[in-house]
Swiss-Prot record:
GO MF terms, alphabetically ordered: rRNA binding; structural constituent of ribosome
PROSITE patterns assigned to the protein according to its UniProt record, in alphabetical order: RIBOSOMAL_S14
Record's subunit section: Part of the 30S ribosomal subunit. Contacts proteins S3 and S10.
Organism expressing this protein natively: Chlorobium chlorochromatii (strain CaD3)
Gene behind the chain: rpsN
NCBIfam families for the chain: PRK08881.1
Key words of the record: Ribonucleoprotein, Ribosomal protein, RNA-binding, rRNA-binding
Protein name per its UniProtKB record: Small ribosomal subunit protein uS14
Lineage: Bacteria, Pseudomonadati, Chlorobiota, Chlorobiia, Chlorobiales
Domain of life: Bacteria
SUPFAM superfamilies the UniProt entry points to: Glucocorticoid receptor-like (DNA-binding domain) (SSF57716)
């Protein structure tokens, strides 16, 4: 389980990215890099980390499901992920 502060920091970044998304897109299109530089660093989408929605784990996360590999395996074996089953051929 990731620290609550790390999860909160990532959530804050997600909110900042959403807040400045339009302005950032306009500035990039206009080529105004001086104004881009003055925006908050955390308003860049690059700084947001994909994290598991259950555990907050930052590595081994399947973006399609929003789950880390451990939780994905656990939930799929329990049958709690619709349409997912163990491969057999």
């Amino acid at each position: 389980m990731a620290k609550k502060s790390v999860i909160a920091r990532n959530e804050k970044r997600i909110k900042l990215v959403a807040k400045y998304a339009e302005l950032r897109a306009e500035l990039v299109k206009a080529g105004d890099y001086e104004a881009l530089r003055k925006l908050p660093r955390d308003s860049s989408a690059t700084r947001v980390r994909n994290r598991c929605v259950l555990t907050g784990r930052g590595r081994g996360v399947y973006a399609k499901f929003g789950l880390c590999r451990h939780m994905f395996r656990k939930l799929s074996l329990e049958g709690k992920l619709p349409g997912i089953r163990k491969a057999s051929w």
